[in-house]
């Protein structure tokens, strides 16, 4: 109370100290704090009592507990229900979440990725709410839209909903919901990249869709253009869309040209893979922002010198993206070799497939899932420590679990050397020794892309101010693309 807070929450979830006392697989004490369920609850009960004894009566006291640790050696839903039911009378509220840091599988639920169903802990909170009387129940975990939260509360599954990532993605979400502007809400897609992913790297929390989040002081007031300029943005991927939105929001007349028939760029590839469909939400969200900002979008529009001269822009943002690249591969006879984009375009593989994962991101994982689900025998050779090494660990570990269940054989520390006669040759990058995979019908290579920056050659001599952003600058992720769409455009126009 002296600190000016209205309440205290005891974090007893996720394998932290309070939950360690609660768990029979961790708590082997033989004194009054171990043994039977009542003794294992004693530590948490005494923490609650000590807070009550030393604080004013009106101070709110709650506890966050995992409703299910989703760990084979952890506390399941039945055990947690009894724990919550017994602790509830001494608490003002219970905050129900899931998971544990005690295992990779359990930790996935600490910040559940897009593969976890929306509001998946609501059935547990509904059951608990019926049993705890006046104690309020808060539920969290993949609740990313206000309509979902309202439904949970309306149906009596909880009194409150926690929506942390939803608020990072769109800090104005509650205000928009209260005004009935639900379609304007930028929905979280559960990618975990710039929120918990940043936190785990010791970086400021942000959002790949909304880089202003966490940088409010820097971008609190976007400078308005003194004179509206005619801005041309070339490329309709995440970088180009964010650039166009930023240019329009600062008072300029903005047109976006996209060479293909759809906006989205590399995000279209992401949403086409198994368990990544929700990533397409970034496209929907940015398209909505384009409309609201008044950006003129022209699809099937090629950017070349004559077209640019005819349009006569005052400034150009090149977000032309990247193009596929295939590394030279020794041999090549007797093994079908495909690029991962060939698979998405409909190419068929043989029965026995080796996927070479150069990137260690989500693409090779998606390829392995896609081909395995179609009936192929898949081996995944990874140019890194493990599949998904470059992506956030909860997303990665959930994917590794899926690959294991599908029977995908994974080999790490692989560098592709060559392929011939139904055999693929690798070098183990740590041991510097050969690794040979035999009986291979098809080798699918997942390499990095190369920047698509052709127009920059003549634009340099045109005298038109311009910036190159996103994959056109260097192929990376949607986070860097959207961030540069914001920062480089502001730099160009102010």
Annotate each language-model stretch with its function:
Residues 446-494:
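C-terminal, flexible cofactor-proximal segment of oxidoreductases
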Residues 170, 175-176, 243, 373-382, ...:
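Internal hydrophobic alpha-helix adjacent to the cofactor/substrate pocket in enzyme cavities
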